[in-house]
């Protein structure tokens, strides 16, 4: 496998099975105790070279769609790096981080977990300064036992937040609503509930598109989505809230969401 990787263009490899490289080996062979940990440590170092907004996206369902909507809302104003597909694991996240380049102005990283301690490890790699939690469901309930445990694990996404870090929570999710005032960071809620910071009103659909009025402290604006489903309204609200927080006007975010 290693010779094949080098032949395909790899300049160096981590290995935990070799004390030294074969005499005829090409490329750099780096002996480590744990290749997965070495990959994550290298990604964490690489991430530290970039002083840009990094948005982590997690939740039991809706992570990928929300990530795509956040990217759409921002891409008209920013050079965006986003997770491709669902590369959101302890292997996929580092590989996404390595795609960061100097041209990128913002990164949107999907972050998934299936066991206790995993989100904290991902947070140390990505070090998001903003994060979205879409909801708390039953995914991985076998490993984590209760939804409260799932919530606690998901919220480790803020472990490496800077003092100005911002968390965007689905205000329609009762488990997230219950903790929104006790978290050690700035919290913005979104949803259809009357007390959400970013709220959808007058939601309607014609079978091909979904339209609603976005109401937030900065004002109101009409939003049109080329998709159906009330869940997508929530995803779009999250995207608009993040966009405004990183300096993208709502009008610009609306254009991105429409397309």
Regions from the language model: what does each represent?
Residues 10, 27, 101-105:
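Short acidic/histidine-rich motifs immediately flanking catalytic phosphotransfer sites
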Residues 24-27, 76-78:
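Acidic, glycine-centered active-site loop in nucleotide-sugar glycosyltransferases
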Residues 27-37:
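N-terminal pre-Walker A segment at the start of P-loop NTPase domains
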Residues 13-17, 83-86:
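A short glycine-rich beta-strand->turn/loop micro-motif centered on a GG-aromatic cluster
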Residues 3-6, 15-25, 132-259:
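Acidic, Mg2+-coordinating active-site environments of NTP-dependent enzymes
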Residues 8-9, 76-77, 246:
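Conserved dinucleotide-binding and phosphotransfer motif residues
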Residues 37-167, 171, 175-183, 243:
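Phosphate-binding loop of NTP-binding sites
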